[in-house]
Amino acid sequence: MADQLTEEQIAEFKEAFSLFDKDGDGTITTKELGTVMRSLGQNPTEAELQDMINEVDADGNGTIDFPEFLTMMARKMKETDSEEEIREAFRVFDKDGNGFISAAELRHVMTNLGEKLTDEEVDEMIREADIDGDGQVNYEEFVTMMTCK
């Protein structure tokens, strides 16, 4: 995972890691993580901080070392890529660019993809994704639909 990072990214992350690693011992503790999160305006609980550490703490020692930090950052960057992909997909469906996917736009794209859907099926797809009930799908609803697997 971390081997897909450029040298520039690794250098950037090393700098960020140093900001977290207040005492310079090469590891980030929950206390150090909390300090940085609070300086960024977040207010995580002790349990949340522990969860964040546990998620990337590969060797189970309760702290994050630099390789574990790199893995975490690489993972986060991967998530950002998929957000960009979702945005692109939304643009494909939103033919007129008004920020909403209508039943007609959905039908058009699905037909181009070789999916012959009845009006009922198209309406059903819109209904499933249409959280606010306005009869069309906005970007937030589209993201929710795409990420709720």
Swiss-Prot record:
Q: Where does Ca(2+) 3 bind?
A: D94, D96, N98, E105
Annotated Ca(2+) 1 binding lies at D21, D23, D25, T27, E32
Official protein name in the record: Calmodulin-B
Functional description taken from the UniProt entry: Calmodulin mediates the control of a large number of enzymes, ion channels and other proteins by Ca(2+). Among the enzymes to be stimulated by the calmodulin-Ca(2+) complex are a number of protein kinases and phosphatases.
User: What family, per the record?
Assistant: Belongs to the calmodulin family.
| Database matches in Pfam families | EF-hand_7
Q: Which SUPFAM superfamilies match?
A: EF-hand
Q: Mention one GO molecular function.
A: calcium ion binding
Binding of Ca(2+) 2: at which residues? Answer: D57, D59, N61, T63, E68
Name any GO cellular component annotation. Answer: myosin II complex
Per UniProt, the keywords (alphabetical) are:
Acetylation, Calcium, Metal-binding, Methylation, Repeat
Q: What does the record's miscellaneous section state?
A: This protein has four functional calcium-binding sites.
The segment(s) forming the EF-hand domain are 8-43, 44-79, 81-116, 117-149
The domain of life is Eukaryota
User: Which residues does the annotation say bind Ca(2+) 4?
Assistant: D130, D132, D134, Q136, E141
- Residues with N6,N6,N6-trimethyllysine modification: K116
Residues modified to N-acetylalanine: A2
